[in-house]
Amino acid sequence: MSAPNPKAFPLADATLTNQILDLIQQASHYKQLKKGANEATKTLNRGICEFIVMAADVEPIEIVLHLPLLCEDKNVPYVFVPSKTALGRACGVSRPVVSASVTTNEARELQSQIQTVKLAIERLLI
């Protein structure tokens, strides 16, 4: 794998990446996950997004760079993970995924884990 794009900031470290990918896998079981840049944009605009995860090895990177701007407008944390293939596997699809959105839900089985990951992502953004 090539070096991650310098525009991909903030980039999660290995432990945070694993934590995020585990949470994404669980969120997909609870139907709290939207896959792809377009669906992530929709969740941001609807206000149901907890946080956004993007892949740093997207080529060209510009296809996801509208999301950090939207996230900052909506005050939603966002983070880059190193691999689109790993993100796709965590989402439960056989294709690479460039971005994913973990959404809010009334059932809230994952709420404590979502809050933990959100805090870790917000610490990266400071």
From Swiss-Prot:
Keywords: mRNA processing, mRNA splicing, Nucleus, Ribonucleoprotein, Ribosome biogenesis, RNA-binding, rRNA processing, Spliceosome. Belongs to the eukaryotic ribosomal protein eL8 family. InterPro entries: eL8/uL1-like, H/ACA_rnp_Nhp2-like, Ribosomal_eL30-like_sf, Ribosomal_eL8-like_CS, Ribosomal_eL8/eL30/eS12/Gad45, Ribosomal_eL8/Nhp2. This is 13 kDa ribonucleoprotein-associated protein. The gene is SNU13. The lineage of its organism: Eukaryota, Fungi, Dikarya, Basidiomycota, Ustilaginomycotina. The keyword Transmembrane does not apply. One of its GO terms (cellular component) is nucleolus. The keyword Oxidoreductase does not apply. GO terms for molecular function: RNA binding. It comes from Mycosarcoma maydis.
